[in-house]
């Protein structure tokens, strides 16, 4: 069972698609670095919808898998 996405992953999922559409030959490592830099520039107010969605996903995950324990 996968862990629920955190706020960064929720945000980066859509942003990654945008970057891949613009630069289809860009390597995944470069895309990840770009996403990391971009996320640091976001204002707290811009992060709110992604934090809320991550919280919703976490609650859904807890309901779907009540006995789930993360074991790396």
Curated annotation (Swiss-Prot):
PROSITE patterns per UniProt: HMG_BOX_2
Q: Which GO terms describe its cellular component?
A: nucleus
Parts of the chain that traverse the membrane: none
Residues in the DNA-binding region are 1-69
Would you tell me the protein name for this molecule? SRY-related protein MG44
Q: Where in the cell is it found?
A: Nucleus
Give GO terms: molecular function aspect only.
Answer: DNA-binding transcription activator activity, RNA polymerase II-specific; RNA polymerase II cis-regulatory region sequence-specific DNA binding
Q: What is the lineage of its organism?
A: Eukaryota, Metazoa, Chordata, Craniata, Vertebrata
Q: Is DNA-binding one of the keywords?
A: yes
Provide the alphabetized UniProt keywords: DNA-binding, Nucleus
User: Would the keyword DNA damage be found if you checked this record's keyword annotation?
Assistant: no
Q: Which organism is it from?
A: Tarentola mauritanica
Q: Name one process (GO BP) from the record.
A: negative regulation of transcription by RNA polymerase II
